Swiss-Prot record:
It is found in: Cytoplasm. NAD(+) binds at residues 273-287. The gene is mnmG. It comes from Buchnera aphidicola subsp. Acyrthosiphon pisum (strain Tuc7). This is tRNA uridine 5-carboxymethylaminomethyl modification enzyme MnmG. GO terms for cellular component: cytosol.
Length: 628
């Protein structure tokens, strides 16, 4: 039974960050309270009806490898699955799925309700309770105190949220939900650096008024991909297509004529928006020579009448939105059933956080999701999982954990945020990861599941399946190395005839698989192949490890060199003013950021190689003193 006032961890907000945070802490055995304005909105897909995409899918796979629920939820609710960048190398291939919004929410709700150690309550938090520079609980609007050892703030766009449609604006966390004004005001009274960001969403269109004839159709890939390492194609609901249309000169002219009604271009809206998901107004202004822009028509569900026109996010007045929609092929007679809008909200400087996502200023207070300056469900969920597990560790007085840049995209994300900060909504891309060949979708479990097991995040069924996959990979890779093909065998004739490979000496199956034109299924047609494996995940892993072995080895060597700096810690330095030779600018930045290692210090903007050399010399001198 719960003591209804005392918990180990309290999570404020039940979006993608909050739900993953609550799941992580409760799985680790902590009594967890999840507070939300509406239980009916648990894990809601507030904007686009999709999970994954370039770089984002890698985060989803990592969440799954650590026992999180996002991948499972989309497997049970995804109505169209595709592999992006399928013609490119495995490092940048990314899974993306359209979601049935209702099914997704219901799946998340079902998972949460089955979770032990978790209590979900409807309540709005208006204040935090502090004691000796530590957070010890929260106060709700109805004047109830809840106490805990740590608190995770995952409030999304609700802190000081303000919706803009044309030149009109009003307070809201998202359309139909009120903003968390009191908590926003209270947090601004603390010593936290806070600023404003904005994001936007397109109008929703009645599917019954769309003319899909003559539009480009996009079906699911065949075979249909699966997100979770525990997933199966049989988990997917019915698959339906999306459609592609375009804006045109008429659309662009309508927008140009009405820019004086845009809150973005009239100065009403100050917050910066996401660079990689701009409004249609931004596209027209920034790319005046473009004749058209893509618009993907994405159904919001199998039983929903809403269509999400991906590509025309806007905050123009509703009457202008109607003109824009009517100018687009296939939407000439369409009806808008919910207007597009921009929303402005508070975010807190992530440079004020440790790599565990705990505040440097307030012990036990963790931040996750959009309030850290990120955009996207996947970025939020991955932060939520990390904040939740570290809140749990903090409540047990145990040292926190975070992945390095060479271990996970999540490591890249938190290092970028806490080291460099952000002035615009941060979105994950594969290009942000310098070790992306080692951080593929297919090996997320091999990178993280053992760590998740030690942390208490991974259950027995996942652990058993993971170990079976590892065994399959090791056994088959050894078999392929031992299995040889003679240049005078029938298989050699097949290789010459079908693949133009002329064997002049005996070759192993493993060496043969290194050839770019040979796939694992090609080996299966050879007489000497004998019996292989049927585990498709293991097969994909084997192919990638063998084909890219040389590149992976070089990257591993680079990572080893990089780890020397990451493992050279700066915790012994309390005041950088005392180190001779550092410029005042460098001293200020180092004192402000308080990097944990030479590696992190080197990634701070303005920290020069010369400054790094001075720090290394200082550490060497201090080490020498201690040996005397």
């Amino acid at each position: 039974m719960f003591n209804l006032r005392n918990f180990d961890v309290i999570v404020v907000g039940a979006g993608h960050a909050g739900t993953e945070a609550a799941m992580a802490s409760s799985r680790m055995g902590c009594k967890t309270l999840l507070l939300t304005q509406k239980i009916s909105d648990l894990g809601a897909l507030s904007c686009n009806p999709a999970i994954g995409g370039i770089g984002k899918s890698h985060l989803v796979k990592e969440i799954d490898a650590l026992g999180g629920m996002m991948a499972k939820a989309i497997d049970y609710s995804g109505i169209q699955f595709r592999i992006l960048n399928s013609s490119k190398g495995p490092a940048v291939r990314s899974t993306r799925a359209q979601a049935d919004k209702i099914l997704y929410h219901e799946t998340v709700k079902k998972i949460l309700k089955k979770q032990n150690n978790l209590l979900i309550l409807e309540a709005e938090v208006k204040d935090l309770i502090f004691k000796n520079y530590s957070v010890v609980g929260v106060l709700t609007q109805n004047e109830i105190n809840f106490y805990s050892r740590s608190v995770v703030l995952a409030a999304g766009t609700f802190l000081g949220g303000k919706i803009h449609i044309g030149l009109k604006s009003y307070s809201a966390g998202r359309i139909g939900d009120k903003s968390a004004i009191d908590l926003s005001v209270r947090l601004r009274e603390l010593s936290l650096r806070v600023n404003r960001l904005k994001t936007g969403t397109p109008p929703r269109i009645d599917i019954n008024t769309v003319n899909f004839n003559n539009l480009l159709i996009q079906n699911s890939d065949t075979p249909v991909p699966v997100f979770s390492f525990m997933g199966n194609v049989s988990h997917h609901p019915k698959q339906i297509p999306c459609y592609l249309t375009h804006t045109n000169e008429k659309t662009h002219e309508i927008i140009r004529k009405n820019l004086d009604k845009s809150p973005i271009y009239t100065g009403f809206l100050k917050g910066l928006g996401p660079r990689y998901c701009p409004s249609i107004e931004d596209k027209i202004v920034r790319f005046p020579d473009r004749k058209s822009h893509q618009v993907f028509l994405e159904p919001e569900g199998l039983s929903s009448i809403k269509v999400y026109p991906n590509g025309i996010s806007t905050s123009l007045p509703i009457e202008v939105q109607e003109q824009i929609v009517a100018s687009i092929k296939g939407l000439e007679k369409s009806k808008i059933i919910r207007p597009g809008y921009a929303i402005e909200y508070d975010f807190f400087d992530p440079k004020d956080l440790n790599l565990t996502l705990e505040s440097k200023l307030i012990k036990g207070l963790f931040f996750a999701g959009q309030i850290n300056g990120t955009t996207g469900y996947e970025e939020a969920a991955s932060q939520g999982l990390l904040a939740g597990l570290n809140a749990a560790l903090s409540s047990k007085n145990t040292e926190g954990w975070f992945p390095r840049r060479d271990q996970a995209y999540l490591g890249v994300l938190i290092d970028d945020l806490t080291t460099q900060g952000t002035e615009e909504p941060y979105r994950m891309f594969t290009s942000r990861a310098e070790y992306r060949l080692s951080l593929r979708e297919d090996n997320a479990d091999l990178r993280l599941t053992e760590i998740g097991r030690k942390l208490g995040l991974v259950n027995d069924s996942r652990w058993i399946r993971y170990n079976q996959k590892v065994l399959n990979i090791q056994t088959e890779m050894n078999r392929l190395k031992k299995n040889k093909i003679s240049p005078i065998s029938p298989d050699a004739d097949i290789l010459k005839k079908l693949y133009n490979i002329n064997l002049i000496k005996e070759i192993s199956m493993s060496e043969l698989l290194k050839r770019p034109q040979i796939r694992y299924q090609d080996l299966q047609s050879l007489e000497s192949f004998r019996t292989g494996i049927v585990d498709l995940e293991a097969i994909g892993q084997i192919e990638n490890e063998i084909k890219y072995a040389g590149y992976i080895k070089r990257q591993s060597e680079e990572i080893e060199r990089h780890l020397k700096n990451e493992n050279t810690f700066l915790s012994s330095i309390c005041d950088y003013n005392k180190i001779r030779g550092l410029s005042s600018e460098v001293v200020k930045k180092l004192n402000d950021y308080k990097p944990i290692s030479i590696g992190q210090a080197s990634r701070i903007s303005g920290i020069t190689p010369a400054a790094i050399s001075i720090l290394l010399i200082h550490l060497k001198k201090e080490s020498y003193k201690h040996t005397l």
